């Protein structure tokens, strides 16, 4: 009986993991198709669905709402302000990258009081700069339903040279805005950027280990209790 119970528990966990992976696969394909339609001028909807809010964002207080991006913001990413920095193929990787980011920071509130997050994903733009994804949480759309809205996605670069910039990450850590960190990914990111990283390693270690900051172990625990 004990063996059967253990088998059922493990099977249940495996099934939940499989379900989550299938959902992510479906989200990836759907968003990639939307990006292709946008590029070809065939995307008619003003809002494009990206995915369901990843659990890691729920760790920072976000609700499990649909994640969408406005077609106008997709235009800025691919053809406007950030044109040339991010290819469509990089953009298509956002759903998977958002499920396992490097860090998440709290940000200032939006124009209508929306709470905001900035997700630092494990992707680089064409300049080698780490990509950040600003979110507005719990936004009501024109069709009167709530979403977590991606406001943009771009690499943190110096304005003139387009070289990767690290000052923003440094200031966010220093100001105590860190809500979530994958410690292994964050340390690897910082070590790769040395000696350009502006903050002493000892101080970074203390900030990444702060007891009020969720980490990858908390994400594993949350995933184990959710499909």
Region roles according to the model:
Residues 1-227:
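Ribonuclease/tRNase effector modules and their secretory precursors
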């Amino acid at each position: 009986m004990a063996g059967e119970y253990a088998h059922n528990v493990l099977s249940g966990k495996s099934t939940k993991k499989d379900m989550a992976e299938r959902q992510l696969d479906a989200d990836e394909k759907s968003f990639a198709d939307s990006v292709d339609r946008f590029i070809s001028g065939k995307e008619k909807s003003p809002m494009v669905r990206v995915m369901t809010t990843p659990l890691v964002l729920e760790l920072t207080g976000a609700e499990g709402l649909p994640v969408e991006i406005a077609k106008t913001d997709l235009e800025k990413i691919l053809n406007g302000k950030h044109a040339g920095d991010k290819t469509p193929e990089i953009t298509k990787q956002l759903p998977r990258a958002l499920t396992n980011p490097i860090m998440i920071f709290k940000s200032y509130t939006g124009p209508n009081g929306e709470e905001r997050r900035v997700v630092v994903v494990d992707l680089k733009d064409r300049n080698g700069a780490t990509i950040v994804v600003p979110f507005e949480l719990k936004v009501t759309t024109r069709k009167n339903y709530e979403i977590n809205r991606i406001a943009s996605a771009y690499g943190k670069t110096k304005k003139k040279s387009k070289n990767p910039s690290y000052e923003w990450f440094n200031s966010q850590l220093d100001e105590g805005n860190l809500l979530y960190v994958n410690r292994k990914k964050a340390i690897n990111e910082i070590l790769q950027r040395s000696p350009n990283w502006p903050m002493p390693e000892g101080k970074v270690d203390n900030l990444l280990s702060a007891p009020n900051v969720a980490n990858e172990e908390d994400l594993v625990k949350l995933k184990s209790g959710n499909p």
